[in-house]
Amino acid sequence: MNPLRPVDTLVVDIAIDNLSDNYSSKPSHISPEFNNVIAAGATEISGSTLCCAQLGLALVLTAVTGNQHHTLLFDAGPEGAIFLRNCRNLGVSLADVEAIAISHGHWDHMGALLDTLDHITRHNRGRQVPCHVNPGMFLERAATLTTGHIAPFQRVPSPDDLAEHGAQVVNSSAPRFLLDDCFYVSGEIPRVSSFEKGRPDHLCRRSAGEPWQPDPLIMDERYLAVHVREKGIIVFSACSHAGVINVLLNTREVFPDVPLYGVLGGLHLAGAAMERLIPDTMAHLKQFELQQIMPAHCTGWRALHALLNEFGEARVTPSAVGSRFTFG
């Protein structure tokens, strides 16, 4: 396996996240939304100049090494108009996106993808955009509600849909390095921890009319990793359906000679079944000695409180839509 190339600086724009938080004080490596929209050209703070929080996640990552910049989109959120509006308000140029990596096949991470591809190709002279997916993402999905009702999820775009909208589809289960080895997209995440058994309410089927089948493990999920020079590896785990401990164990196995610096993403510790895992998750996180834990999206407020109690404010820096994280 090729080494993950260290980058001098990594900038992460939070284009979609569940929460908006402009008023909490933030450490120096996080630029808040108010600052970012004014820097992008807004002349006032208003409803139209700010970002919209929305269930989902979309991250625009720019890796800088010397004079070289590489920009990757990791997920696109649930709905195109909001994602594109947020990027515009933040001054994020999607024409600079050189590749897209999708974490897993859920609507709140892929719903905006076709509109996003249309926008990118309109502004990059029609150049196809590599879009990295895996075959397990394209099943029909659903969840069993607390009422017992089965609620189908919106179908995600198919590989053919993606290609029709300007994607160069890379549909493979294998791990891969992207953009001069600045980004690593994992393969299937081994499920080895004793307590992370997936999402019990989750269902799937191959086509309409077939019976729904239990699908707690959501094996199509992948994580993203970046090595920031003099810090270590930052892991981006969009939903952590594999369990964040399994994600970090795999990262450490793949890159045994590089320390893990931080993790950003949804830890999926919300909902009665998942909240039972919070104590074990806190205990097992200690082994990684992370300097930054950046909960987002589906982490849940109970898990956020537990993280703050266990690791403190210096190490736990929650994500919010419109924020910009800079490492290095």
List each language-model region with its residue ranges.
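Pre-active-site segment of Zn-dependent metallo-hydrolases
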Residues: 48-55, 63-99, 114-115, 121-123, ...
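General small-molecule cofactor/ligand-binding pocket signal
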Residues: 13, 132, 168-173, 184, ...
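Short acidic, glycine/serine/threonine-rich loops at helix termini
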Residues: 25-26, 113, 142-146, 275, ...
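Divalent metal-coordination and catalytic microenvironments
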Residues: 61, 75, 87, 104, ...
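Short hydrophobic-aromatic micro-motifs
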Residues: 74, 179-188, 234-237
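Cap/insert and terminal regions of metallo-dependent hydrolase folds
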Residues: 99, 106-110, 210-323
